[in-house]
């Protein structure tokens, strides 16, 4: 039973209501039956990733590149309904959409957009966002990860902590200090020197994959 204390539904248009209803139904039918066991076993229900993509829930606010181009209200409603099932489900979708796909869409080259956005939208690829570090949290000014130019490449060294989706990601958006200031890098996780270890035995967000990332002289083309 959905209780709308603030009468939000009266403010929604038909498309927004339809998407909210479809996600609510998905959570009840697919997330609710498995999420307690996933939480207890410290596992993410990876079998639900493709169905999430089939519903069009990745990169919903992006127009083109295999994304539906919906409004921000719909994205908020999607996250709200997923959160009802488990915060790990919402976290998976919001990281994929807001922290990986959107930076690539907003700041990436056309080549990078064409390479990654369709794959991320269809769940052919999973992404993670590397900002937080053990010593400084999510404060960019305290980052120790650094990148230096080497000809036409960048060499990145450092580590990241508490990274959602890190150990299952195919691509990572990594932030690092450079001589020119803080920069973001799109890194294929198969790059030599990139290591991701899953963090075990958390007290919360147990149905979410959380990882520590290590970068040992990883080479990224400009």
Where are the language model's segments positioned?
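Flexible, small-/acidic-enriched active-site or ligand-binding loops
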Residues: 142, 190-219
């Amino acid at each position: 039973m959905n209780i709308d204390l603030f009468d939000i539904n009266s403010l929604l248009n038909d498309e927004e209501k339809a998407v909210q209803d479809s996600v609510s139904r998905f959570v009840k039918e697919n997330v609710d039956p498995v999420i307690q066991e996933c939480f207890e076993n410290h596992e993410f229900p990876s079998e639900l990733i493709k169905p999430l993509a089939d519903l069009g829930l990745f990169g919903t606010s992006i127009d083109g590149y295999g994304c539906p181009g919906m409004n921000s209200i719909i994205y908020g409603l999607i996250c709200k309904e997923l959160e009802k099932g488990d915060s790990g489900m919402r976290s998976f979708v919001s990281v994929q959409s807001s922290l990986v796909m959107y930076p690539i869409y907003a700041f990436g080259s056309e080549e990078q957009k064409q390479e990654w956005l369709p794959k991320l939208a269809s769940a052919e690829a999973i992404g993670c966002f590397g900002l937080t570090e053990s010593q400084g949290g999510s404060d960019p000014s305290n980052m120790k990860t650094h990148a230096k130019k080497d000809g036409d490449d960048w060499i990145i060294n450092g580590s990241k902590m508490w990274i959602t989706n890190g150990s299952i990601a195919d691509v990572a958006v990594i932030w690092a200090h450079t001589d020119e200031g803080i920069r973001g890098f799109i890194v294929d996780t198969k790059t030599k020197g990139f290591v991701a270890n899953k963090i075990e035995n958390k007290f919360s967000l147990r149905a979410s994959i959380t990882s520590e990332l290590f970068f040992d002289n990883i080479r990224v083309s400009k």
